[in-house]
Amino acid sequence: MTKDYQDFQHLDNENDHHQLQRGPPPAPRLLQRLCSGFRLFLLSLGLSILLLVVVCVITSQNSQLREDLRVLRQNFSNFTVSTEDQVKALTTQGERVGRKMKLVESQLEKHQEDLREDHSRLLLHVKQLVSDVRSLSCQMAALRGNGSERICCPINWVEYEGSCYWFSSSVKPWTEADKYCQLENAHLVVVTSWEEQRFVQQHMGPLNTWIGLTDQNGPWKWVDGTDYETGFKNWRPGQPDDWYGHGLGGGEDCAHFTTDGHWNDDVCRRPYRWVCETELGKAN
């Protein structure tokens, strides 16, 4: 029995020895695994929280940037509209100023033109007055000379180079103007030189004025018989053209001074001013 007890005890000792060899290691491995998984979870959670914070910050900044951009766009739009309004206002104001300046310039030019015309008329009146005074002086001298011959131009006529000239202030057709001169024992002016043309222009001014030149009966002729072909001429370029497109019937058979002094052929029925001419001492 003692042997059996010893064997049993020996068996228990062996079992204890084997148990000590296998030991309790499985428990720490499980705990280590659990700890490793928890660390990964914490790390993942931390990274997730960090990522969430970053996303929130970026989202917040993006929203702020969008708001700032919207405000900038609105401010730029307002500035653009305001600038356009100011530009339009300045443009409108500039146009008004430009129109006023043009109006003032136009009025000034008109006043200057009126002054020039008044000055020209005044000079003509002065010249006519001087001519009348000379004519009166001439006639008075003739009377004082007990009828001795002294040749003078009539009052209201102007003497130039041995001829007397009368300048109209009204208008007539060419034929009526020629008849008027004939009643004064004169004829429509016959221009034979540049000097005579300048003299007539100085007294008439820039006006359409009949002269004693016509081709109603064929070729161009001066009313006093002065030779046309070899004499002085001052036609406007392209004239005479005997134009029929004026709608008044017939051609253009009578000559006149234009406003620039050149000659032009025109319809004889047009009403223009005229100049009568006669030799000194022949006028009525």
From Swiss-Prot:
Cytoplasmic side, ranges: 1-39
Subunit structure: Interacts with LASS2.
Any one Gene Ontology molecular-function term assigned to this protein's record: fucose binding
Principal location listed in the UniProt entry: membrane
Keywords on record: Calcium, Coiled coil, Disulfide bond, Endocytosis, Glycoprotein, Lectin, Lipoprotein, Membrane, Metal-binding, Palmitate, Phosphoprotein, Receptor, Signal-anchor, Transmembrane, Transmembrane helix
Binding site for Ca(2+) 2: 215, 242, 252-253
Note: Calcium is required for ligand binding.
Gene Ontology biological-process entries: endocytosis; immune response
Expression by tissue: Expressed exclusively in hepatic parenchymal cells.
Residue window of motif Endocytosis signal: 5-8
Binding site for Ca(2+) 1: 190, 196, 277
Residue sites binding Ca(2+) 3 per the record: 239, 241, 252, 264-265
Lipidation (S-palmitoyl cysteine): 35
Post-translational modification summary for this protein: Phosphorylated on a cytoplasmic Ser residue.
An annotated GO cellular component: external side of plasma membrane
Extracellular side: 61-284
Subcellular location: Membrane
Sequence ranges assigned to domain C-type lectin in this UniProt record: 160-277
InterPro entries reported in the protein's UniProt record: C-type_lectin-like, C-type_lectin-like/link_sf, C-type_lectin/snaclec_domain, C-type_lectin_CS, CD209-like_CTLD, CTDL_fold
Glycosylation site positions: 75, 78, 146
Membrane topology, as annotated: Single-pass type II membrane protein
Official protein name in the record: Asialoglycoprotein receptor 1
Protein's UniProt keywords contain Glycoprotein: yes
Entry's transmembrane regions: 40-60
Superkingdom per UniProt: Eukaryota
